[in-house]
Amino acid sequence: GYTYKCPHCDISLTYHKTKNHLRCHYCGYTVIKSDICPNCQEKSIDDYGLGTEKVEEFVKTLYPSYSVVRMDTDTTSKKGSHERIIKDIEAHKYDIIIGTQMIAKGLDFPNVTLVGVVNADESLNLPDFRSGENTFNLLTQVSGRAGRGNLKGKVIIQTFNPENKTLNFVKNADYMGNYTYEMGVRHMLSYPPYCYLVLIRVSSKDYDILSTEANKVVQYLRRSLNESSKVLGPTTASPFKVNNVFRFQIIIKYKFDENIKPAIDFIDKEYAMNRDISVDIDINPLRI
């Protein structure tokens, strides 16, 4: 089927039903949803996926007598709306709370006895070596919303892979098991804490210039660094294009290399005044 994509970014648009428009969450581009397919001109259009709006609609259909509140960037964007929703929840004005990750962290909702997580696989499949760790932390946090005080709680996690190790560590509250497993994977693949990382992101509005310069950076690094250091890339960043700017990334893995700092300083100075190319350097990045 046809997928609406942002003309400025390498990303699909997200449908917001309340405003009946599709929006890019990277550059803010919006377009009104059409009832006719732009590709084949068919009128039988349906939207797929499971965002908070669709979950809210589905829950209200299943439980029409229950009061439901949705807590996400749309419902909390106006001044004071975030605090108002929290106060209403604390005052027991709602039976069901639907939200994004923001409801999992740092909030203490009394009388919550059931927590459901939809599509837990999504964060596990992110192209980041910390995806397992981050998923374990998030699911452990959201699980802690259920059964506060003397109340018993229950947590239901939806997944297409119930045998996944990380999800089973969450199920069994096995912190040490998750730690041991993650450390084993990182040691085998040489990821932190068994090495240091440097992420270099090169971006430009001109793809040809970007490709040439990104490869120059890689060649320079491979000449300058010790043989024990690994230079990976250049590869396309995710997303590849944001607001009409193309992006490549280069990753350096190293343990001990006295040439790292001089090489990074040289690259930083070399492109500091270049209007066609932007170079961002992140030492030990939290995400890659």
Segments the model singles out, each with a brief description of its role:
Residues 1-201, 206-211, 223, 250, ...:
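Inter-lobe coupling/hinge segments of SF2-like helicase ATPases
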Residues 233-243, 279-288:
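Short proline/glycine- and acidic-rich turn/helix-capping motifs at secondary-structure junctions
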Residues 194-198, 244-248, 275-277:
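Residues at beta-strand starts and edge strands
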Residues 213-219, 260-270:
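Short amphipathic alpha-helices in soluble, non-transmembrane regions
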Residues 116, 235-237, 242-254:
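Solvent-exposed, membrane-proximal periplasmic/extracellular interface segments of envelope transport
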Residues 248-263, 277, 284-286:
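Short, charged interaction patches at domain edges and termini
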Residues 63-66, 221-230, 272-276:
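Short secondary-structure junctions
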Residues 68, 155, 229-231, 279-281:
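Generic structural signal for residues in well-ordered beta-strands
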